[in-house]
Amino acid sequence: MARLLIYDAYENKVYTYANLNENNPMPYSTGTTLRVREFRGKSASPTLWTTIAAMEAWTLTRRKYGKGIPVGYAFRRIWEGGHGTRSQHYAGVSFDVGQSLTRTARTAIYNAARGTGAWGYVEPLSQTPTWVHMDRRYGTPACSGTTAGYPTLRRGSRGCYVMILQDALSTLGYQTGSRIDGIFGARTEEALKGFQRRTSLRVDGVCGCNSWKKISTAVIGVGRTKTTID
């Protein structure tokens, strides 16, 4: 069973789906084209998250391609690792697919994904020779000179990047609350200030480029700790 958080950027709200069966379809996806277990992949997390926009992009791509798309990797928590320090997989908006398919089939999926215009980024096939990468990143990256990474967050922010921040801070021992909720409130701000203070960053309660770099580097792949929340 899984608890699923879905961020609605259109309304700036976070919706919670409790006790989803692993064979249930992902909310906002078409039919059974993407089940919870496929989105989860190898993650052992009881709590998952994504966005409505990512599910809409998946649905459009699946419809355009016209047949099943095997998912190799989708959701991961940042402390589980397996991807780069600022991977969109940790936000639940990234898919690596088609690993078991032929090059021709992967090219067709790539063209379908590009053709929808719904993804934030579809990686060139020259960089993904045995899979197709597509993600629905959103927001302006906190670090300049790149289209990758996470946006600046502060009190009042909402969404999947706040979920990454809460996940990372709690795992590092800075408590943001009893559960991950994707809402940057007073406790998340104080937890961030605590991390900033201890790591000699500017203590302003704003998660910008430097804070993201230090937090990501400190937490990636460390595994679940006794202070990790779900």
Across the structure, where does each feature detected by a protein language model lie?
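C-terminal extensions
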Residues: 220-230
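Cell-envelope/glycan interface and biosynthesis
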Residues: 3-128, 132-136
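Catalytic cores and adjacent binding grooves of peptidoglycan-active enzymes
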Residues: 4-7, 85-93, 99-172, 178, ...
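A short, mixed-charge helix-start or loop-turn motif at secondary-structure junctions
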Residues: 39-43, 151, 177
